[in-house]
Amino acid sequence: MNRLILTFSLLLLSAQSALAAPTVYIPLGSANVVIAVDAATDAITATYTDVYEAHGLVATPDGEYLIAGSFRETPLKPGQPKDTPNSTLFFIHPAHGHVMSTIPVAGSSHHQAITPDGRYVLSTHGMRGYVSVLDLESNTIARTVPTGRAPNYTLITKDGKRAFVSNSGSNNIVEIDLATWKVVRTLESGPAPEHMAFSGDESRIFVTNPRAGKVSVVDVRTGKVVQSYKVGKAVHGLDIGDDGRTLFVSAKKENKLVAIDTQSGDMRTLKLEPQPYHLNTITGTGKVYVSSAKKPLIWVVDQKTLKVVNTIKLPGGEAHQMAVVQE
């Protein structure tokens, strides 16, 4: 009897864990869809169509809506103002299973970030030199904020007061005061910065320098680069692990995923081929999702052992910026 009760309890706990697992929403670029993945089973559970050339993606904090950017833009005609809307943001309602609306925007967008209160979505527009600010209360672009040449990636602090934008063409990171929507400071970044991730306490920013094959560590208080890690050619995606100290970084041209202990500096390497690309740690699961730039798949990697434990076969395209929603 006791053994039966124990078995039932374990099954119940397992079921509760599965129910509590996050959902991961993933844009598939050239496949023109966004998918939903159950992080407990790594199974694709939904597909949202007509999301054209989506690269960046965020979810509202309650998981009710997704906002995706697009690389697709219509060329401007001679004489048209530069701020003429010629691209799109897609507003997706997962419960309804489709794109609910589209928001016109000037210029293709690369990556997205959302404020913790779910009010604003910031999109980087690399060819325009600014971030656009979508107000989700009105579903309109409220403003644009010039940041520098080729803005790539945005981080927003947990308190919602500041945003940091990497400018690949300006070789810097800028800080935006979200109360005034003005750039208030310029930070070092290493050469041609792209993807970024905060340390757990937000005291440091880890930023990729793809051309230099390294990750720079920026002290947020001083704005100075205080350390760097040599990772390999064409570093791309990065994220911090569940333990708050392990940084996972992909190097496309060396076909590897690197796990860096940010306290000791020790590195572990996992070969992944071809071309590991975007990645996300899936908080609470011990997993890292790593996409391939060349094949429609995602490797599921165990954070502790750095071994591939599953592979998600995608319906097409390539996986880009992922949004993780905790159930």
Each language-model region and where it sits:
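Predominantly soluble domains enriched in secretory-pathway, periplasmic, or organellar proteins
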Residues: 4, 10-327
